[in-house]
Amino acid sequence: MSYNTVQYLKTDPRARYQGYTFFFKEGLCWSDINTTFLKCRLKQKSINDVKSMSLYGLTSKVPEYYIICLINSTLMSYYVDNYVNNTQTFQINDARQLPIIVPSQDELDELRIIFEDAIRIKKSSNNAEELQTLQQRLDKTVDRIYSIK
């Protein structure tokens, strides 16, 4: 995107130029349309789009990788489907309704390892069996944080 294009979008009365303070910032995102199981990923520096919902961390107590792990957990998928929105869309206002528990440092460390393992597997082999095992580890960890037995 060129400087002239950005200037046009900022000044043209027909342009819908919103949220530009978040342009070219890393964060987390997910597709607007999903199945029962939500899938969230790290968002590279880019311009936001309505079909890929984006969020940005505001505090180190709840880092982006932690929120990504929560959204990717089976618990949050079931929570959203049963209590927030049982349609095929998961939008920003739905995400705002997620119950976020501030984790301990040990819990953050554990989820950071799971997060990094997921990226490594996706980049290297995309092995379905390894990913399934990692999903089970993630689910057990999130269930423990939320005191689900």
PLM region spans:
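Polybasic, glycine- and aromatic-enriched phosphate-binding surface used to engage nucleic acids
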Residues: M1-D109
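Non-catalytic DNA-recognition/assembly elements of restriction-modification systems
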Residues: V102-K149
